[in-house]
Amino acid sequence: MKDIFIVEDDALIAMLLEDMLSDLGYRVCATAPDLERALAAAKDTEFDAAILDVSLAGRSSLPVAKLLDERGKPYLYATGYGSAPEGSTPSTLPVLRKPFQLSELEQAMKLLAEA
């Protein structure tokens, strides 16, 4: 699991996340700042796993999660809200609470790989 798709509406957080993932040996193969681009990339891009912001400019990323479920792609949520969005499929996938440290991201990625 090396190629990661990031869905994040805050450009600074997306860049920080990309840098952190690179430090951990992952490659970010795609990013999307809004729901429409996230859905398009989730359909058309090859990646191993995804990190989804729960809220994209006030819109839930749940449609992206459902598409990833259909494709069998693992993902985790990164959120300042503390939990996955309402309506999420119950799962053992980790939720990364913002703000997070490199060690927390590393642990979440390990859990994601094991899921």
What are these regions (language model features)?
Residues 11-30:
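Two-component/phosphorelay signaling modules centered on CheY-like receiver
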Residues 101:
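Receiver (REC) domain switch/active-site region of two-component response regulators
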